[in-house]
Amino acid sequence: MKLNIVPARTGLTWVKLGFKTYLQQPLAMSGLFFMFMALLSIATLIPLIGAALALALLPAATLGLMAATQEATKGKFPMPTILISAFRAGKQQVRAMLVLGALYAAGFLIIMAISALIDGGGFARLYLVGGKITEDVVRQTDFQLAMWATLALYLPLSLLFWHAPALVHWHGVTPVKSLFFSLMACYKNWAALTIYGMAWVGIFVVTMLVVTVIAAVLGNPAFAALALFPVGLLIMAIFFTSIYFTFRDSFTDTSTEESSTDISVAEGDPT
């Protein structure tokens, strides 16, 4: 397995490929994303363990969407069963994916525990259990500190797991190694990933502003309230479609030349 170092402009290419692939199979990719959201939402309804279970399922579910994108790039219509690809790859890989999910859940819950030390658990409770967000709560200094601490700590966690599910599934890498390789790939391609992330933040912000402006022009504030949610889900579906390309261009399969669980570094120029 070879790690490709890509130029910064590749970040924009990943975004474009996300839109292009989504438009090739809009019905399939939208449907799978909604199934993805429904699966995690249903998991959270289970008493006591719901939130942890949803977190543990997230790496496998994300892998399912990546597999769907891969199918779409081949001109195929991804079927609903592709969402559980991680659990159809043999006992060894299923076990590895479950371990990866458990590590992700543990890491996230540790972050929530740290945030609870800052504000007494207000932010963590709101995030994991839900509840009403009031202006008074948001203005609390401890709540804001807990929120920013969570965001700061989640960044390294997300980088550790960014490529990990795909490495486990497609390259047979062990969970611990997949975390290391994922972090290394994100570090080596930090410029492309930064451009990629900034582009998506820009797309989200501009889209929300456009919807708000349209509502203002129409003189109908209810339009914004009704449109923001489905439009936000649409953008999220395209975002998840694009994630596969960040993995595809970062790693090259060289299993015929060397062990697939070893890694070498090479300069690359995917466009």
What role is predicted for each listed range?
Residues 1-271:
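Hydrophobic alpha-helical membrane segments
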